[in-house]
């Protein structure tokens, strides 16, 4: 183990140019390629990274869902629903009474969050999907 530790200590003291020269000499002496050994590792990392990048991709369209409306808050929620959807009084009332129900679909994140906040301030429970 002492030999290995000595080699590690010597490698730590190498400059960048000396390390590059060492790699070149190892390639020639042992007939190996440092790039060929590193390429599969990089390819695996790149493919794993690409998969996670797709999973991390942020959603751009949201659906605002009215989950629950307490009976004593129906009128306030009804006003918010009408403002968000542009529905008439009867249509908005039917929508509020049919909860859980989507209020609006395909909204931007900012609009959906603002609508959710308005509904919650009026007393309703809302979610984004």
Swiss-Prot record:
What GO biological process terms does the UniProt entry carry, in alphabetical order? translation
Q: Report residue spans for region: Disordered.
A: 101-129
- One annotated Gene Ontology cellular component of this protein: chloroplast
**Primary site of residence:** plastid
One Pfam family it belongs to: Ribosomal_L12_N
Any one Gene Ontology MF annotation carried by this entry is: mRNA binding
Q: Which cysteines are joined by disulfide bonds?
A: none
Keyword terms of this UniProt record: Chloroplast, Plastid, Ribonucleoprotein, Ribosomal protein
Query: What segments bear the compositional bias annotation Basic and acidic residues?
Result: 101-123
- Give compartment(s): Plastid, Chloroplast
Identify the SUPFAM superfamilies for this entry. ClpS-like, Ribosomal protein L7/12, oligomerisation (N-terminal) domain
CDD domains with a match to the protein in the record: Ribosomal_L7_L12
Main role? Answer: Forms part of the ribosomal stalk which helps the ribosome interact with GTP-bound translation factors. Is thus essential for accurate translation.
Q: Which PANTHER family match?
A: 39S RIBOSOMAL PROTEIN L12, LARGE RIBOSOMAL SUBUNIT PROTEIN BL12M
**Quaternary assembly:** Homodimer. Part of the ribosomal stalk of the 50S ribosomal subunit. Forms a multimeric L10(L12)X complex, where L10 forms an elongated spine to which 2 to 4 L12 dimers bind in a sequential fashion. Binds GTP-bound translation factors.
- Protein family according to the UniProt entry: Belongs to the bacterial ribosomal protein bL12 family.
Query: Could you tell me what this protein is called?
Result: Large ribosomal subunit protein bL12c
Q: Which species is the source of this protein?
A: Guillardia theta (Cryptophyte)
User: What lineage does UniProt assign to this protein's organism?
Assistant: Eukaryota, Cryptophyceae, Pyrenomonadales, Geminigeraceae, Guillardia
């Amino acid at each position: 183990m002492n030999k290995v530790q000595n080699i590690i200590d010597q490698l730590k003291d190498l400059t960048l140019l000396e390390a590059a020269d060492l790699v070149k000499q190892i390639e020639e002496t042992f007939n190996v390629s440092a790039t060929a050994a590193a390429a599969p590792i990089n390819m695996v990392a790149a493919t794993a990274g690409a998969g996670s990048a797709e999973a991390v991709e942020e959603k751009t369209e949201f659906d605002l869902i009215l989950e629950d409306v307490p009976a004593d808050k129906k009128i306030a929620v009804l006003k918010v629903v009408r403002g968000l959807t542009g529905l008439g009084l009867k249509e908005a009332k039917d929508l509020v009474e049919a909860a859980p129900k989507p209020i609006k679909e395909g909204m931007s994140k900012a609009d959906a969050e603002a609508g959710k906040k308005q509904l919650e301030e009026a007393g309703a429970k809302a979610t984004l999907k």
